[in-house]
Amino acid sequence: MLYALGHPASFGVLLVSFVVGIVLHGWVQGLAAVAMGDSVARLEKRNKPEPRVHIDPFGAVGALIGGLGWAHPIELPGRRDRRRAVVVALVGPAVNVALGVGLLLLWRAALNGGLSAGEAAVWGHAGGAGTDLQHGFSFAGDALGFAVLLAGASQLYLGVLSLIPIPPLDGGRLLFALAPSTLGWQRARHHLIGQNIGLVVVLVMLVLPLGGRLLLLAVLDQVLAPLLRVLLGV
């Protein structure tokens, strides 16, 4: 995101989208947890839309450097309550993805015109969206259209990033919450969560380039390119 400072409008949209997306993500997870009987989430005010509660400092670093980050992890109940673990872990990413899809469909239906056919094709084939989330671009012409487009992509990528099965991301925390209590899984949990190796892995993949591109953004570009082709109509 810091690389987008050369494009102030892009930087502003990315910053607002990140904060809104993270707060929504953590808030709905907190609401779901409290609704399903989690008193700890209530005490920690996870069911309140307060940015300081939901913004994770390491996730914010990832967003500032790599363009994407994650919310402060919420405690999952584990195997003793599989249903609650699944619902709480997945509701946050689902909200981000739904918001992203909605914004991109809004752009296509009502605001199309800010992105050329060639630029849209880059987003839908090989996925230039990840690069734009990191570096931004100039809002030449239809500023509102560009803002909606960039915010939509930001939310979509944020939601899918959260599903990657590496802690502290939601997908990784859900994986270990549901994992059996075998020695192998306990060792993996100790290293990836207890010693924060998972956090280091995610940050490295998100902020260090591989062949000129950030690894996680490159992976997300490939995964999301087919969906972007449909949403953007290219």
Predicted regions and their residues:
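Hydrophobic transmembrane alpha-helices and their immediate loop junctions
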Residues: 1-234
